[in-house]
């Protein structure tokens, strides 16, 4: 459940279209996965990719990343573009948006099942099967436990939300009372 910056989404779309055109989507996805791990490592060190790129060391960051992770030419040139446009800070969001582009292209929707306790795999599969038939797409569901909903479930995917929780029912009831009185 990420709220992404429009700049990140735009860059991800551009990268995805080029990867499709060159038929290297899986390689670019693999490169971005490696870069994501590198960014996580930097975050633990309280550093950012942008900061390292600005350092006046003799090493070229993009060449280092390319040789260390074996990046393909598209990913390498894309990183150079981000560096040139001072957009390296968006890389983690671009990776998330790129993954969303790939899932959409493959006909996969990511969803969240919010419940008060962890559901069994078979119960999740039942919900998943119902919504896959409704959406006519493959659905990947993550079960999130949130005791604040009191009871029931909330299912979120794309821009949709089915709130069948007790808290949701109480809030809808409150709204109706306020409208009528």
Swiss-Prot record:
GO-annotated molecular function: proton-transporting ATP synthase activity, rotational mechanism
Source superkingdom: Bacteria
Cellular compartment(s): Cell inner membrane
Pfam families referenced in this protein's UniProt entry, alphabetically: OSCP
SUPFAM superfamilies associated with the record: N-terminal domain of the delta subunit of the F1F0-ATP synthase
InterPro entries reported in the protein's UniProt record: ATP_synth_OSCP/delta_N_sf, ATPase_OSCP/d_CS, ATPase_OSCP/dsu
Residue ranges that the Swiss-Prot or TrEMBL entry lists as coiled coil: none
GO cellular component, one term: plasma membrane
Main location class: membrane
Topology class, membrane: Peripheral membrane protein
Annotated keywords: ATP synthesis, Cell inner membrane, Cell membrane, CF(1), Hydrogen ion transport, Ion transport, Membrane, Transport
PANTHER family: ATP SYNTHASE DELTA CHAIN
Known role: F(1)F(0) ATP synthase produces ATP from ADP in the presence of a proton or sodium gradient. F-type ATPases consist of two structural domains, F(1) containing the extramembraneous catalytic core and F(0) containing the membrane proton channel, linked together by a central stalk and a peripheral stalk. During catalysis, ATP synthesis in the catalytic domain of F(1) is coupled via a rotary mechanism of the central stalk subunits to proton translocation.
Family affiliation: Belongs to the ATPase delta chain family.
Subunit structure: F-type ATPases have 2 components, F(1) - the catalytic core - and F(0) - the membrane proton channel. F(1) has five subunits: alpha(3), beta(3), gamma(1), delta(1), epsilon(1). F(0) has three main subunits: a(1), b(2) and c(10-14). The alpha and beta chains form an alternating ring which encloses part of the gamma chain. F(1) is attached to F(0) by a central stalk formed by the gamma and epsilon chains, while a peripheral stalk is formed by the delta and b chains.
Name of the molecule in the record: ATP synthase subunit delta
Native organism: Orientia tsutsugamushi (strain Boryong)
């Amino acid at each position: 459940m990420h709220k992404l910056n429009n700049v990140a989404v735009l860059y991800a779309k551009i990268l995805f279209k080029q990867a499709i055109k060159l038929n290297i989507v899986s390689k670019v996805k693999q490169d971005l996965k490696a870069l994501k791990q590198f960014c996580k490592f930097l975050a633990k060190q309280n550093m950012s990719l942008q900061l390292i790129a600005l350092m006046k060391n003799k090493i070229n960051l993009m060449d280092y990343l390319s040789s260390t992770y074996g990046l393909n030419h598209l990913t390498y040139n894309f990183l150079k573009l981000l560096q040139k446009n001072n957009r390296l800070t968006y890389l983690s969001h671009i990776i998330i948006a790129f993954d969303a582009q790939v899932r959409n292209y493959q006909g996969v929707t990511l969803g969240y099942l919010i419940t008060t306790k962890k559901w069994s795999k078979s119960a999740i599969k039942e919900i998943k099967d119902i919504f896959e038939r409704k959406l006519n797409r493959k659905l990947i569901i993550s079960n999130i436990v949130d005791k604040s909903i009191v009871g029931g479930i909330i299912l979120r995917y794309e821009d949709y939300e089915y709130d069948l929780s007790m808290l949701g029912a109480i809030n809808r009831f409150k709204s109706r009372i306020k409208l009528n009185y």
